[in-house]
């Protein structure tokens, strides 16, 4: 059975893990590739403490982001309905469709907070009426907003 050495990754490597992970690798792999190219460093007690502190900070930051997403979801449900104005033909059909970019602009104008349009899922909207769009605010938090399409 071959001897393995522990190293701390300083950048993410697809086959090993993420930045900050402690992994066991073959001594030659560590000595010839990971350490000389700065992709890993040897494990020491001080480095382990640094990793623990860094992970604690990341956890606090992640919880803060989640709480902000929950607060924003509450704000969106408080507002309730967003109105989007579009041009309509004689038969009541829209010129074009309502896109997730249109929804993002409506939310931004009402809340003064930017939302990435790629986080919004909008059904195909080709006519006037009320619709529901889904917004992913965080990995664990999503919201549904009502959209009123008017002329």
Curated annotation (Swiss-Prot):
Q: Which GO terms describe its cellular component?
A: ribonucleoprotein complex; ribosome
Q: Which top-level group of life is the source organism from?
A: Bacteria
Q: Which UniProt key words apply to this protein?
A: Ribonucleoprotein, Ribosomal protein, RNA-binding, rRNA-binding
Kindly state a single biological-process term from the GO annotations of this entry: translation
Looking at the Swiss-Prot or TrEMBL record, what is one Pfam family this protein matches?
Ribosomal_L9_C
Similarity field = Belongs to the bacterial ribosomal protein bL9 family.
Q: What does this protein do?
A: Binds to the 23S rRNA.
Name of the molecule in the record? Large ribosomal subunit protein bL9
Look up and give the organism this protein is from: Prochlorococcus marinus (strain MIT 9515)
């Amino acid at each position: 059975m071959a001897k393995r050495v522990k190293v701390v990754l300083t950048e993410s490597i697809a086959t090993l893990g993420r930045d900050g992970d402690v992994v066991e690798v073959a001594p030659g792999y560590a000595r010839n590739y990971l350490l000389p190219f700065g992709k890993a460093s040897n494990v020491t007690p001080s480095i382990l403490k640094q990793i623990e502190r860094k992970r604690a900070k990341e956890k606090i930051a992640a919880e803060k982001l989640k709480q902000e997403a929950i607060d924003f979801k509450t704000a969106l449900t408080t507002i309730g309905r967003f109105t989007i104005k579009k041009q309509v033909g004689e038969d009541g059909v829209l010129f074009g469709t309502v896109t997730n970019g249109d929804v993002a602009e409506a939310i931004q104008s009402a809340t003064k907070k930017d939302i990435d349009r790629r986080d919004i899922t909008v059904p195909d909207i080709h006519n006037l009426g009320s619709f529901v769009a889904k917004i992913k605010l965080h990995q664990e938090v999503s919201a549904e907003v009502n959209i009123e399409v008017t002329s």
